[in-house]
């Protein structure tokens, strides 16, 4: 009876044998020795290895919210009703700004506020004159730009830096930041799009280190245009921006990044994206440009009447010329232009229609922009694209064509006009040249080399040399590029030298290649070993297509392909 009055041990204190059998553990003999069950079964009564931990009781959600509210009320009471504190929206924007400008942490101390203001002034007054892809009012300060467009400011800093080592560091950080925001955080903003456009226009070709990134960053810009909806009319409200799957509730948390009111900044961005991707597509030959839409035509018409920025009308003319070039390049006569295959010539009615469009563009240029160099460069390049169809490899049974001969001389005339204008730019001005003009220089050099080596009845190659000697032009470009660094005060530090000096060395290498292949150049002495030693292992990224002339089959054939387009 005594054993039946004993109570079992409390939960968690049973011996290991009873705990394993999930039985009550009743002690015997005052708690000493074996328990009742182990005694009857003649088993070893082992003490438990460790007591089971009891999880603390969690507070209910209502209690947690009450404690948070009590903490907020006590915090507000301690500030005594101050009104000078930032609002939650202001605080959020400040935190975003701190996160977005984290790339500045390593380089902010190196630049003074005066030099930063000079960067902004130079970018606004010099670079945007050649490619007005954005409008920065004169009243905008560096602080304003850092707060409103932090990624754009980082790109401007990299472009305008006169220290090659710091420029290289900024370029790498910009790529890292762009990858994080675009691919990791899936961020979509006008600031990102404008920064990517600046990257494409200047950083890829003028800054260090050179990387083959034109194609990938072009697709980034096109993707941002799609995500922001800039190629389509702005919806009247955000409820119309969701996809069908989101409309039925499959993705209820998805927020649209599309604005309901189209701004002038957005119109400039989408047109600039079209201009840049159109030129890059022609330059590389392995991608397509941003597709033209009716809404982009509306943006073009609005900018044509804009009085907000003088650059708007320049951008309008650049866009119109690229539209015509795209129309020319999509014609059947262009199929053999950059290859060794034969192709049909440009029909007369096609030529007259395209010539009429080009003359319309010329006639609609405002009087004050008649001598604008960026517009003239694009007009020359458009005219060259129109007449270069005469350089396609003739069909085997094709008779002599006086029209083809006229087009060849028209190409020669346009190339001469282009370089005559190009050499009016002072050495310091070449640093402001954007990607479109570098591509146009390469285009003219390709055409001039083909004109200098073309065999066609009635075509006089000595006239080409007397009109525009490609060796003299290459020498002049090389000399001027070598003067740019000193003209702008560029400091070459670290492993990266002056990018413009590399341009000059690259032109010297090209000149040596041309001198070997050009006829009647026996008087030109070419030392290939010295040319290669002066240009050791130049890594030019997408500019490798400038250098790899010896690998192009059309050079050996004397006609056919289009040199820089690879």
Curated annotation (Swiss-Prot):
The keyword Cytoplasm does not apply. The keyword Nucleus applies. This is Transcription factor opdL. Residues 15-45 bind DNA. InterPro entries: prtT, Zn2-C6_fun-type_DNA-bd_sf, Zn2Cys6_DnaBD. PROSITE patterns: ZN2_CY6_FUNGAL_1. Disruption phenotype: Does not affect the production of oxopyrrolidines A and B. It is found in: Nucleus. GO terms for cellular component: nucleus. Keywords: DNA-binding, Nucleus, Transcription, Transcription regulation. Transcription factor; part of the gene cluster that mediates the biosynthesis of oxopyrrolidines, polyketide-amino acid hybrid compounds with feature structures of tetramic acid. One of its GO terms (molecular function) is zinc ion binding. Its main location: nucleus. Signal peptide: none annotated.
């Amino acid at each position: 009876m005594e054993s039946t009055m004993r109570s079992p041990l409390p939960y968690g204190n049973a011996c290991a044998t009873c705990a394993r059998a999930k039985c009550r553990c009743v002690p015997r003999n005052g708690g000493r020795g074996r328990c009742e069950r182990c005694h009857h079964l003649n088993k070893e009564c082992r003490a438990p290895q460790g007591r089971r931990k009891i999880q603390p009781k969690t507070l209910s959600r209502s209690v947690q919210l009450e404690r948070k509210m009590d903490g907020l009320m006590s915090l507000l009471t301690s500030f005594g009703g101050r009104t000078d504190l930032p609002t939650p929206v202001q605080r959020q924007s400040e935190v975003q700004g701190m996160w977005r400008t984290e790339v500045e942490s390593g380089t902010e101390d190196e630049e003074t506020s005066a030099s930063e203001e000079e960067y902004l002034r130079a970018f606004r007054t010099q670079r945007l004159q050649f490619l007005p892809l954005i409008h920065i009012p004169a009243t905008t300060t560096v602080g304003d730009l850092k707060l409103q467009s932090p990624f754009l400011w980082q790109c401007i800093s990299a472009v305008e830096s006169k220290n090659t080592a710091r420029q290289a560091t900024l370029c790498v950080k910009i790529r890292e930041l762009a990858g994080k925001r675009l691919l990791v955080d899936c961020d979509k903003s006008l600031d990102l799009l404008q920064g990517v456009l600046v990257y494409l226009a200047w950083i890829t070709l003028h800054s260090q280190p050179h990387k083959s990134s034109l194609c990938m960053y072009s697709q980034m810009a096109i993707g941002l245009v799609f995500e922001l909806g800039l190629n389509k009319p702005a919806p009247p409200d955000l409820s119309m921006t969701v996809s069908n799957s989101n409309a039925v509730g499959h993705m209820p948390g998805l927020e649209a990044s599309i604005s309901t009111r189209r701004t002038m900044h957005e119109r400039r961005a989408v047109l600039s994206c079209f201009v840049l991707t159109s030129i890059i597509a022609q330059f590389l030959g392995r991608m397509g440009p941003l597709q033209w839409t009716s809404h982009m035509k509306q943006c073009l018409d609005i900018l044509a009447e804009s009085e907000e920025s003088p650059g708007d009308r320049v951008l309008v003319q650049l866009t119109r010329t690229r539209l015509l070039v795209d129309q020319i390049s999509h014609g059947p006569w262009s199929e053999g232009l950059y290859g060794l295959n034969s192709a049909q010539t440009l029909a007369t009615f096609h030529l007259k229609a395209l010539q009429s469009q080009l003359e319309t563009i010329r006639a609609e240029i405002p009087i004050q922009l008649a001598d604008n160099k960026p517009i003239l460069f694009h007009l020359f390049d458009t005219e060259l694209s129109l007449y270069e169809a005469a350089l396609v490899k003739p069909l085997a049974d094709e008779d002599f064509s006086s029209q083809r001969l006229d087009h060849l001389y028209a190409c020669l005339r346009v190339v001469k006009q282009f370089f005559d204008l190009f050499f009016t730019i002072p050495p310091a001005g070449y640093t402001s040249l954007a990607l479109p003009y570098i591509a146009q220089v390469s285009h003219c050099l390709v055409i001039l080399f083909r004109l200098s080596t073309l065999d066609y009845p009635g075509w006089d190659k000595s006239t080409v040399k007397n009109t525009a000697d490609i060796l003299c032009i290459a020498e002049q470009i090389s000399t001027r590029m070598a003067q740019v660094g000193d003209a702008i005060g560029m400091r070459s530090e670290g492993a990266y030298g002056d990018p413009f000096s590399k341009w000059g060395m690259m032109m010297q290498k090209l000149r040596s290649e041309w001198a070997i292949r050009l006829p009647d150049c026996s008087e030109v002495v070419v030392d290939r070993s010295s040319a290669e030693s002066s240009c050791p292992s130049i890594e030019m990224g997408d500019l490798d297509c400038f250098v790899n002339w010896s690998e192009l089959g059309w050079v050996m054939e004397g006609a056919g392909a289009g040199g820089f387009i690879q």
